[in-house]
Amino acid sequence: MSGGVYGGDEVGALVFDIGSYTVRAGYAGEDCPKVDFPTAIGVVLERDDGSTMMEIDGDKGKQGGPTYYIDTNALRVPRENMEAISPLKNGMVEDWDSFQAILDHTYKMHVKSEASLHPVLMSEAPWNTRAKREKLTELMFEHYSIPAFFLCKTAVLTAFANGRSTGLILDSGATHTTAIPVHDGYVLQQGIVKSPLAGDFITMQCRELFQEMNIELIPPYMIASKEAVREGSPANWKRKEKLPQVTRSWHNYMCNCVIQDFQASVLQVSDSTYDEQVAAQMPTVHYEFPNGYNCDFGAERLKIPEGLFDPSNVKGLSGNTMLGVSHVVTTSVGMCDIDIRPGLYGSVIVAGGNTLIQSFTDRLNRELSQKTPPSMRLKLIANNTTVERRFSSWIGGSILASLGTFQQMWISKQEYEEGGKQCVERKCP
């Protein structure tokens, strides 16, 4: 075995699972990540005269470069000229400087230990490109000089977290909903089906609803004080006096935080295809916005998530050919070899934060059982706890990196030095 033995339990391998919405990181062998903070980060570019803003809790980039504000607390402070950006696009790293800032921050503030002491297992999108994988490998070995590295596809890790090596992973996160077939721990690339209808899409739908209802979205950072008002009456709040000139992207990010809270508290998927009459009978949910305005939401709380299952229902997308969630699953299975289909239908694993909308799995189960051929046994695997569903690929990574049998799988520093960054293609399927 090359490059020295790494005993998974003793070394304390680190597991990074960087998604489009949050970053999850922590030690292998633990049952949940140590940190979970937004992937969106604040960036203040340099002023013309070369001076930046006051340095308090920012992470300075390269000399004279931008200042990054990472983690919930630093990001949510209003600052002049701070843009909110995300290093990822389509689940893959796009902006390497800000991606590196996230890693630096995690090592400095949360791991609080030398990067060179811990092997790293990192999750990646199943469609990650070869060039990006090699660049990431190079970054980890050259810049952080870690002792060993491994890249694993998110879907495979999710399957492992649920004790399976074969199954169909339905992952609905922030930017996309995907069905990914996994067989014996390998992703079947030809069967991947993606749809852009996911968490961010629901956020957009909520935004449109608020515009129709004339509800003004006021993020908490603007509010100095507010008074309790009767249901449905106009809000009575005072604006903060000295607010800096914030950028549009950052203000948007703060508004989205409010909407995401609304999404989690109010929305529900209807049990069967959306029907005005049935929806009107459903109990309403009371919600209060940060500025004190409050009202009840009835049918609309079922109408918004309906777009996930029945895209023809969504206004503004008429004539679209997008697939609903259950179609994504059946299409994906249909693209796989006929012999392995029973194994896929037999463990459809639901993961991702967007699937936590109330009754999501019930509706999916119902639709799939109507679409599954009678010869197949359908089994839907969905953890009930938020943690396991949001962190499923991190948990899978934690299990994998601490297995004794996995220890010969690492790309060791020695192998990297001998074989270069190409070894990631060979060692990490």
Curated annotation (Swiss-Prot):
InterPro entries, A to Z: Actin (IPR004000), Actin_CS (IPR004001), ATPase_NBD (IPR043129)
Residue positions, PTM Phosphoserine: 86, 233
UniProt GO BP: blastocyst formation; chromatin remodeling; DNA recombination; DNA repair; negative regulation of cell differentiation; nervous system development; neural retina development; positive regulation of cell differentiation
Disulfide bonds: none
Record keywords, A-Z: Acetylation, Activator, Chromatin regulator, DNA damage, DNA recombination, DNA repair, Growth regulation, Isopeptide bond, Neurogenesis, Nucleus, Phosphoprotein, Transcription, Transcription regulation, Ubl conjugation
Cellular component terms (Gene Ontology): brahma complex; chromatin; GBAF complex; Ino80 complex; kinetochore; npBAF complex; NuA4 histone acetyltransferase complex; nuclear matrix
Localization terms from the record: Nucleus
Entries under Pfam families matching the protein: Actin
Modification sites for N-acetylserine: 2
GO molecular function list: chromatin binding
Family annotation (PANTHER family): ACTIN
Similarity remark: Belongs to the actin family.
Protein name: Actin-like protein 6A
Gene: Actl6a
